[in-house]
Amino acid sequence: MTKIKIVAVGSLSPKFKSLDEEYAKQVGHFCSLSLSELKEFSEEKNIEVKKEKETKLILDALMPNSKVILLSLKGKQIDSIAFSKLIEMNTNQSFTFIIGGSDGVCEEHFESAQKLSFSQMTFPHQLFRIMLIEQIYRAFMILNNSKYHK
């Protein structure tokens, strides 16, 4: 069975958490899904120090031997069909999707990771978490020829 772990800096507010849980339940029919919410060092004034601290937590949370996908503005943009093919090509393997903090991550620690971007636009952090899990759900719907994706 495919294993997917979402590693995200920060936590969801209750209004986003219920939607996240709804998608997670649906995704759970197709894969083993887990989430690691990591501490955001919002009190840290030095952005580089903040990114280093958060990046260390991310690195510690990675699943061993998993395909690491960093969500980054510098990443490649793909559509939902291509995203579903990415998951299909790695069926029965492990993925770790990384959502860094509001200031990003120290990308030099993720040179071997695949980098994806959803857009050049900026999204609220909590909304992006929902967008990611929805795209994971959509990918499985595409792979199962569901009418969900039109």
From Swiss-Prot:
The keyword S-adenosyl-L-methionine appears for this protein: yes
Primary site of residence: cytoplasm
GO CC term (a single one): cytoplasm
UniProt KW keywords: Cytoplasm, Methyltransferase, rRNA processing, S-adenosyl-L-methionine, Transferase
EC code: 2.1.1.177
Enzyme class: transferase
Catalytic activity, reaction form: pseudouridine(1915) in 23S rRNA + S-adenosyl-L-methionine = N(3)-methylpseudouridine(1915) in 23S rRNA + S-adenosyl-L-homocysteine + H(+)
Top-level division of the source organism's lineage: Bacteria
InterPro entries: Alpha/beta_knot_MTases, RlmH-like, tRNA_m1G_MTases_N
Compartment annotation: Cytoplasm
Molecular-function GO term, any one: rRNA (pseudouridine-N3-)-methyltransferase activity
Positions that bind S-adenosyl-L-methionine: 71, 100, 118-123
Similarity field: Belongs to the RNA methyltransferase RlmH family.
Subunit structure: Homodimer.
Summary of the function given for this chain in its UniProt record: Specifically methylates the pseudouridine at position 1915 (m3Psi1915) in 23S rRNA.
Protein name: Ribosomal RNA large subunit methyltransferase H
Gene giving rise to this polypeptide: rlmH
